[in-house]
């Protein structure tokens, strides 16, 4: 639930700094309530599966937290559901994850939805 703020810096983070609920620990490190699960999953893979050379797929459901409303300090708890595919940077892997997303949305009963892809390298590959 708690993460170091540095994990979510501009280069790697998915939440804006002003949307994170921040505080300090006893060592004066800046901590945040987790705004996104992806870095935590990536850290676990790097630590526990560093010897793996084959594709690895993970899925999760977890609570994430963002501060809504400028300067209001209101905390919003959001259930994040995600899937990650590691050890494959091919366009086929990207297509697999997009297909999984679409299948899950359809299975949930949604008939109309929009998917936004925010990774510039994916569009360069197209």
Label every PLM stretch briefly:
Residues 1-126:
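TRNA-recognition modules of translation machinery and tRNA-sensing kinases, especially anticodon-binding
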């Amino acid at each position: 639930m708690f993460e170091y703020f540095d994990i979510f810096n501009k280069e790697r983070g998915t939440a804006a700094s002003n949307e994170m609920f921040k505080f300090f620990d006893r060592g004066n490190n800046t901590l945040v309530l987790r705004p996104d699960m992806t870095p935590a999953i990536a850290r676990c893979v790097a630590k526990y599966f560093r010897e793996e050379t084959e594709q690895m797929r993970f899925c999760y459901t977890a609570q994430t937290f963002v501060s809504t409303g400028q300067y209001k300090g209101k905390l919003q708890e959001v259930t994040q559901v995600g899937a990650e595919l590691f050890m494959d940077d091919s366009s086929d892997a990207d297509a697999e994850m997009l297909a999984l997303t679409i299948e899950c949305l359809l299975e949930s009963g949604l008939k109309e939805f929009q998917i936004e892809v925010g990774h510039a390298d994916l569009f360069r590959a197209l």
